[in-house]
Amino acid sequence: MTIPKHILDKFPKLSNDKLLNNLSLPSGRNKMILDTDTANEIDDQFALAWTLLSNDKIDLLGVTAEPYSFQHHKEELFEAYDIITNNKKIDSSNQELVNNYYNWVNGLIESKKHPNDIYFDTPKEGVEKSYQEIINIFKKLDINHEGKVFRGSHKYLENLDEPLDTESSQFIIDMCLKYPNEKIYVCAIGCLTNIASALLIKPEIIKNMVVVWTAGFPTFSFNHNKNSLNLVQDVYASQLLFEC
């Protein structure tokens, strides 16, 4: 998949010097937005807590909630479960599928559970759970969350001509425009839907928005990051970030 020319033409062309400056190693106290699917896995909660307790290092402008969902695994999980539990033939057409889901299926069998017993949050449910969990972390640290926490996209991008205008995407835009002469570090530890929507709505923020994204890292964690969950949830958003 490539990004259409009419989309890319909306973005300012940054010089090499500007790009290198934006990507240079930061020093001092920097303005940051944390973009997180906090209710998905415990690492986001640690990241948020560390950020909130690092006021000497980070000027936290706000926290934006991301959607998350494992629904894209559902069909393959059911297929692998059927193959394994019914002793169906394993050949070159399904070997990789079985390998990828073997431990997951085996865990279900040992627990006497069926894939039907697993509930897969929708992206809409995921973003709301993340929003509430962000507030929960603020409260546990006795830090006021008013004006600091924003709901994000309730779904993933379906095309690049219809960005999702949300509290989160607007907040990202507002902060980049408010501080045009400063780098705004948007640290994303989930999918890129909020960030991509902000870019599509206001392409000029590319000038001072620096995205730091956790995705595609080497891992021995079975299955979940095989193809980078943060990347594959919203392929349109991920592709835009690489090409714009």
Q: Which positions does each model-derived feature cover?
A:
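N-terminal acidic, glycine/proline-rich low-complexity segments
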Residues: 1-244
